[in-house]
């Protein structure tokens, strides 16, 4: 299938021992590896396709269509990663009624590998998110949310390491500051850590201690904030850190 068509509907990136213009130093020209990276973000409980008369996304989306695309691309390359950058919850009656159970079960059926947490994933409270974790047969990563005084302690890791076609891949997550965006009673004692400082520490660990060939950030910081230059975004993150090969972003629906 045409990758461009997939990207328009789902979002994805392919790598042939090269991601974001950075050649992986671990592999020579004779040792090229091929991985495919598929990703979603801000799906907001959109289980069904948008209606044909929808003003922005007529007859697009839906889990069934996503499943078909993913299956087709996996058949072309078994070394495929499937990632999500947060805001899985909220937006349709499916979430209002099932509280996230359906979203996690369907993502598990699609065999997602890793996801990070968005602000709307707290919409049914941190306890509500925790309650649904058994339905998620994939891992959650968040390096700058400290959950040690919450029910999510030990259930969300800062990063996950995977190996695809001999490429060692470190995947870590970052979330937006919740204060002022989400009611305190929803995220309880979740502590927000500076994404820049956390990233410098995590990427150094992944690169120099874990010896990862490729480092991916699942970010729910938002792409850019022109009206608030001090607010940390994906662009700020890229400019002020090193060792990230690929940022997969969410939140601003960019």
Task: Indicate residue ranges for each PLM-predicted region.
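Acidic, metal/ion-coordinating pockets
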Residues: 3, 7-254
